[in-house]
């Protein structure tokens, strides 16, 4: 191992061991209690400064601003009252809910042959997570999926938790300015003014939403993926044969949840996949997804032709018993679709898709994922693992977008969705890829038509191919658009896409870009309450409350750093201008002066005031401002007077 790799592992290990609670600036962790004491839904509450609304310098009049509550994925990592210990894992939030349903049983040991072999290997003791939980499985004849409960008319604690979480405490806002929202265009989505537990149950029962919640991952805070809810963002992490360690992956997990990752996919392809995944699951407050095919391939030494159902089945059970919440399964790639990719510019770009295509051609038969799909569903139903039906034939270039191969597979995914629903297994559908802007809506329309409104989950899509190093931007454009059209979850893309494995900083950049895209989509489709945070930040901006601007942003740290590059002094935090326009040309300062001018001139309406202000005798205006400046003591800067 190179010295730089050793140092990276050491740094990550140090960060994990010394992990301290680091909440966002001026934010508090708050919990909203549901109908029972153990339903405590976390929110991040951002405290705001008061607004100066009148008075004099000696006797200013202030008006308080309500704190803003925002969706929080960071788990207990930002709760000052919790003592973090990654070696013990997170609290088992859902364990009591699972137990009281009385439809599961505890196993004496692991069922997977591979898991048994790993446990027996003493050389792995130092790598292994030391506090392994007892495995849980559905009792004989029972189904333990949230879809099953929803279809039975049962509102689970998870559903109530989600309803509270999706509303983000917006019911408490009385401020008309904060509540103002433009009507959106939802393209047929059903967006109620308030999310109720019954609405959550109904959406899950109809297959329009999923709650990824493996019974062996009780640490995960319940969340929902669906067209009629807030758009979610997935972050990918994972080691490879040439890069990254267990320590670094756990660090990236915690980092991902801090910056808004609603789910995390572990796409590890290197050594010690099993052990890495255990560490991630025990320390993850969000659902974890995987592509089981990657690990199955490792078990046959990377030779795709040697894959078989027995290896795959054992891998599915292994991961389900560890607590993986959703599997990406490329079961819709059929043998007859492979020739359709021959004329493509970039062929088959999905790793899972290329593995299946190679296997199909080598054996000249349909893949074992397709022929054993019902058995896959039976396994998932025992643990409540959701299926993310993979798009192995997604386009890898804009030239290949929306071709016959892509849409043929999509129609098969729709057929498989109905099969999974027969077993009460939750389903989402994966989508592209690389699609130019004018062709994106067709993807959403086709998915809704052929996949029966099961939630759509897309990688971008990237809207152009010319920007390696900036593909978080090329894809963020497409992500915002398809989110508006109805996509339920967006898989983030980092600046390293097509270039290398992302590091910690890349993960943050990708997540911030995609949280922005998701929020833009929520605004466009008119999700209730989506505009509250925008309104609060805009009000802070107009009132030159700089700290509130930073703290309300998606990335307060970067916002503050950019401001301080040119105005680092504390006086810059109270100045009524920034370095972009300077004190003389700040549009918002001028606008405030226009308002004051109109207020002082009782006979003049606001629109007239603007005209007078701009074209009236400029010399008289300058004389007035000169007198005001002298009267104020000829002070260039006037700090904001703090409320007592």
Curated annotation (Swiss-Prot):
Requisite cofactors: [4Fe-4S] cluster
Top-rank taxon: Bacteria
One cellular component (GO) term of this entry: cytosol
GO biological process: thiamine biosynthetic process; thiamine diphosphate biosynthetic process
EC number: 4.1.99.17
Enzyme class, spelled out: lyase
Keywords, in A-Z order: 4Fe-4S, Iron, Iron-sulfur, Lyase, Metal-binding, S-adenosyl-L-methionine, Thiamine biosynthesis, Zinc
Reaction catalysed by this enzyme: 5-amino-1-(5-phospho-beta-D-ribosyl)imidazole + S-adenosyl-L-methionine = 4-amino-2-methyl-5-(phosphooxymethyl)pyrimidine + CO + 5'-deoxyadenosine + formate + L-methionine + 3 H(+)
Stored Pfam families: ThiC-associated, ThiC_Rad_SAM
Cofactor descriptive note: Binds 1 [4Fe-4S] cluster per subunit. The cluster is coordinated with 3 cysteines and an exchangeable S-adenosyl-L-methionine.
Keyword Secreted: no
Residues reported in the UniProt entry to bind substrate: 236, 265, 294, 330, 350-352, 391-394, 430, 457
Record: residues binding [4Fe-4S] cluster: 578, 581, 586
GO MF annotation, one: carbon-carbon lyase activity
Binding sites annotated in the UniProt record for Zn(2+): 434, 498
Ranges in coiled-coil conformation: none
The protein's annotated pathway: Cofactor biosynthesis; thiamine diphosphate biosynthesis
Keyword Lyase: yes
Function description: Catalyzes the synthesis of the hydroxymethylpyrimidine phosphate (HMP-P) moiety of thiamine from aminoimidazole ribotide (AIR) in a radical S-adenosyl-L-methionine (SAM)-dependent reaction.
Subunit structure: Homodimer.
Similarity comment: family membership: Belongs to the ThiC family.
Protein name (record): Phosphomethylpyrimidine synthase
